[in-house]
Amino acid sequence: FSLLRERKTILIYLLVAGIGGFVYAQFNYLLPLNMGALYGAEGAEIFGVMTSVNALVVILATPVVTTFFGRIRDVRKILLGETLIVVGLFCYRFVQGIIPLYFVLMTVFTIGEVFNTIGVQPYVTRRIPSTHWGRMNSIISIASGAFSGVGNLLIGKLVDTSGFDSAWLVIGIAGIFLILCAAAMCITDKKYFPLLYEKSTPGGTPEAFSDSEPESSASGSDK
């Protein structure tokens, strides 16, 4: 916990991981429920094709994103990824019954998934000492799992009582808050990890920084 006090922007990231886990979970929870309500048994077939599109876009987009967006800092990849995930999911609220747009939004969602995936792990390893990687990854997994688990229960009850439109609205509100948290993480990151911004390398990463203290903490100890 002393590590988190010294690197307060990591606390914001834990919030991003938690809310992001809740929003992302709707891909396998609220979305198939909605497809089933709209199309009955055929909804499972449509959702199956959507997941196939998801897998195909992951295969095609990952090398493209890695090659052409490699110099974007990991924290900005997370912001971009979470934004695309939110847009790709929440917009299903507005395209009910327009099947071709389902696949357009799934493509947007999946590209966001790719950006987020290639940004998250480097973000953690470059800002946390290697001695704490295991513990931090456990905390992140717990936060994400707790938010998604409790969130799915609440979304399920909301669907039963108020319908899918209200459930998607909650996802949209949570998504906006998620994007704001990710933006705040981008803003505060340079304050707590200035050394990461000193060299113009892919991801902005000086060597072996993950085992050092944030410059703001070090400068405070010299006074």
Language-model-derived ranges and their functions:
Residues R127-S162:
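A late C-terminal transmembrane helix in Major Facilitator Superfamily
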